[in-house]
Amino acid sequence: MRNILAIGLFIIACLFVVSCKEEDTSLQGKMGYLRLDVATVSSTNTKSAVPENYNPKQLHVEIKDASGNIVKRTDNFDLEWKGEEMMLPPGNYTISASSNGFDGNASGEGIPYYTGSTTVTIPVDGSSVSASIVCRLANVKVTFRFDASVLNVFRSLAMEVSSSVSGVDSQLASCSVTERVVYFPVGDLTVKTSVTNMAGTPFPALEKPITGVKARDHYILNCKLGDSGNGGITVEADDNIIPYIKTEIKNGQL
C-alpha cells in the first residue's frame, strides 16, 4: 500500500457579529471558523539539504486565499494548530501541506517526503463544511537486498545507486543480511554492482538503468547468484509493501 498521510480538516462556518467599528465592514459581520487537527502533514519549505533531526511527520501547513496570499501558516502542526480553531472570512482557500524544512531533493536513509493539498470554501450562511488533505510520498523509495546465496561466495560485493538529478549523492550498500532502505528525488536511477570473488578477481561491473521513475515508486534491488554463478541484479517495482499512515482532524478552539 502506498505511503499515504491523510489529514482531515473540519471547517465550521458561522455568523460573527462585528462590534468594533474599526473592523472591516466589507465582511458584513460574517466570519468562518477553520478547525484543524493533523498528525503528519506540512507545506512546502524548499530546502534541498536535509535538516538535522529531520522529522517527515512534522508538518508545515499553509492556508492561502483566492488571491494566493498566505493567511495562516505553521511549521509544526501538532505543536501549534492541532485541535485548534481559527477564524477566516468567507471565501475560497487552498490548504497545502508537506514535510517541514525539506523539499525531497536529496538522497539518504530515513528521509521520506510527503506533500498534498486541497481547496475549501468557507460559506457565509453559517453551515458546516469539511475538507481533507491526503499527503502522499513525493520521493522514491529504494531497498537494497542481498540474497543469502551471495553472502559467502564473494570477497566483496556492493550495489550503488546514482540519480539523474543534478547534485544528488549516490547511495551504496555492501553485502549484508540486513536490508538498507534509502530515498531519492524523482528521476531516473542507475544501479551498479562491484564484485570481487574469493580469489581476489574482480568481475566486470554490472549496470541496470531504471527509467520512468515516479513519485511513490518503490524499487527493491535484489542481488543474487545468476545461472552462471556470477552476481546479478534484479529490479522489482513494488509499492504494495509501503504502509500508509492515516491522520485525522479533530475539533478544537483557538
Label every model-predicted segment.
Residues 20-73, 78-79, 85-254:
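Extracytoplasmic cysteine-anchoring/structural motifs
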Residues 1-18:
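Sec-dependent bacterial lipoprotein signal peptides
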